C-alpha cells in the first residue's frame, strides 16, 4: 500500500513550493492518491497535512476523491477588519496564523477548494467522508459588507456527498466561506467564520445536517446560515454575532435551539416559502443598534419571520434595545415575531423584553395560530380572527 499520509512541506513529488502555491501542491498530491489507489474495493483515501506556516494559494484545489482529510494545526483566525481599521505599527502580529492559507486565486477561479466529481452520482457514486480540519482560509483583502466583495469562496461542494465534515477551521475575508450542495449528513462544527459575505450555505437539497458550536460573525450582506430544501437539520449551540441571520427556504423539521443571536438588523431567523414542522426553541435573541447597514429588512419584518405550517417557537428570550430614532420605518412599532403565512403555528412561553413597544403580528392569511404566554394583549397585532391567545400575565 502506498503512503497515505502526506505533508505538503516534505512530499517529494511536489514541483513547486507549498509556500508559493499550496493549491498546486495539493492537486499534485490528489493526483498521486488516485494513481496509487486504483482498486474499487481498496481506496482508503489519505491525509494531507498542512503544518503551521503562511501559504499562498494561487491555484484552485479540486477534490474528487472520497475519504480525504485535509488538516492543519490550528484555525489561526485574526480579525482583519479590526486590523484594517486600526493603527498596527506596534502590533505583535498582523496576519492570521497557525496553518494559514492566503487565497489569492490567480488562476481565475473563485474557490480555494472545489469538491466535485464528474459524472452522475447514481452512476459513479457520491463523494464520501471528506474532511477539512484545523486551518485558516484567508481572502487577504476585503471591505464591508463583504458581498460581492472580493468574490472569493473558501470551500464549495458541488457534487452529491455523504458525511462531509468541516471542523475547527478559520475563515476570514471571503464572499462565501462554505457552500455545500446535495449534502447527506454533513457536520459543520467548531469553526470560527467572520468578516465574510455569507458563512454557511446548504444549497440544492440536504438532509440531517448538523451545524453546531460555531462562531459566525459579521455576515453583513448575506447569511450566517442559509439552507434550502433541507430536511431535518440540527442548528444548535452557535454564537451568531452582528448581522445574525438564519434563513431557511422550503425547509422542514429543522431544530434551531440554544443559539445566541446578537444582531443590529431584523430577520434573525426567517422561515421562507413553505417551511413546516420546524422547532425554534431556547434561543437568545438580542437586537441592538450598531454599525453596518442593511436595506433588506425593516423592523416590521420581525426578528423571527414565519411562512409555513405547524412551526413551533417556544422558550426563547427576546431582548430588544434599539433607540426609537433608529427604528425603520420611522415611527413604526417593531415586530418581534411575524407569522406571515400558514396554518397551526404555535408560539409558547417566549419572553419579550423591549425598551420600546414591540409586537407579535399575525398576517391576515394565517389560520389557527396558537399563542400561549408569548404576548400580552397589548403586544398582539392580529389581522385575522383565526387564532387562540393565552396572554402573558
Curated annotation (Swiss-Prot):
Superkingdom of origin organism: Bacteria
Reactions accelerated catalytically: Produces alpha-D-fructofuranose beta-D-fructofuranose 1,2':2,1'-dianhydride (DFA I) by successively eliminating the diminishing (2->1)-beta-D-fructan (inulin) chain from the terminal D-fructosyl-D-fructosyl disaccharide
Top-level EC class as recorded in UniProt: lyase
GO MF entries: glycosyltransferase activity; inulin fructotransferase (DFA-I-forming) activity
N-terminal signal peptide: none
Keyword Lyase: yes
Stated name of the protein: Inulin fructotransferase [DFA-I-forming]
Amino acid at each position: 500500500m502506498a503512503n497515505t499520509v502526506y505533508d505538503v512541506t516534505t512530499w517529494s513529488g511536489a514541483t513547486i513550493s507549498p509556500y508559493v502555491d499550496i493549491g498546486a501542491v495539493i492537486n499534485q498530491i490528489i493526483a498521486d492518491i488516485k494513481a496509487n489507489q486504483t482498486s474499487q474495493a481498496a481506496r482508503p483515501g489519505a491525509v494531507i497535512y498542512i503544518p503551521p506556516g503562511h501559504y499562498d494559494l494561487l491555484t484552485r484545489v479540486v477534490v474528487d476523491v472520497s475519504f480525504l482529510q485535509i488538516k492543519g494545526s490550528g484555525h489561526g483566525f485574526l480579525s482583519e477588519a479590526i486590523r484594517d481599521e486600526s493603527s498596527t505599527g506596534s502590533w505583535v502580529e498582523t496576519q492570521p496564523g497557525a496553518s494559514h492559507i492566503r487565497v489569492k486565486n490567480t488562476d481565475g477561479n473563485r474557490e480555494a477548494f472545489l469538491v466535485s466529481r464528474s459524472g452522475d452520482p447514481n452512476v459513479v457514486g457520491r463523494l464520501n467522508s471528506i474532511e477539512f480540519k484545523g486551518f485558516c482560509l484567508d481572502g487577504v483583502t476585503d471591505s464591508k459588507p463583504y458581498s460581492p466583495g472580493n468574490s472569493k469562496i473558501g470551500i464549495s461542494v458541488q457534487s452529491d456527498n455523504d458525511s462531509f465534515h468541516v471542523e475547527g477551521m478559520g475563515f476570514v475575508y471571503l464572499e462565501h466561506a462554505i457552500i455545500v450542495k446535495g449534502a447527506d449528513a454533513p457536520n459543520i462544527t467548531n469553526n470560527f467564520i467572520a468578516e465574510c459575505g455569507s458563512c454557511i450555505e446548504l444549497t440544492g437539497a440536504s438532509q440531517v445536517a448538523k451545524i453546531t458550536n460555531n462562531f459566525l460573525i459579521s455576515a453583513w450582506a448575506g447569511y450566517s446560515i442559509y439552507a434550502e430544501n433541507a430536511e431535518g437539520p440540527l442548528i444548535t449551540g452557535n454564537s451568531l454575532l452582528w448581522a445574525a441571520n438564519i434563513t431557511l427556504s422550503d425547509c422542514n423539521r429543522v431544530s434551531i435551539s440554544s443559539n445566541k443571536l446578537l444582531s443590529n438588523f431584523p430577520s434573525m431567523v426567517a422561515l421562507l416559502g413553505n417551511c413546516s414542522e420546524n422547532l425554534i426553541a431556547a434561543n437568545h435573541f438580542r437586537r441592538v443598534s450598531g454599525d453596518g447597514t442593511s436595506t433588506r429588512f425593516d423592523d416590521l419584518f420581525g426578528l423571527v419571520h414565519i411562512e409555513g405550517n405547524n412551526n413551533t417557537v417556544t422558550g426563547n428570550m427576546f431582548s430588544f434595545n434599539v433607540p426609537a430614532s433608529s427604528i425603520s420605518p420611522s415611527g413604526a412599532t417593531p415586530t418581534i415575531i411575524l407569522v406571515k403565512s400558514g396554518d397551526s403555528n404555535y408560539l409558547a412561553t417566549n419572553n419579550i423584553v423591549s425598551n420600546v413597544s414591540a409586537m407579535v403580528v399575525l398576517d391576515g392569511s394565517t389560520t389557527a395560530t396558537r399563542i400561549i404566554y408569548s404576548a400580552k394583549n397589548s403586544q398582539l397585532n392580529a389581522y385575522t380572527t383565526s387564532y387562540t391567545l393565552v396572554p402573558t400575565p
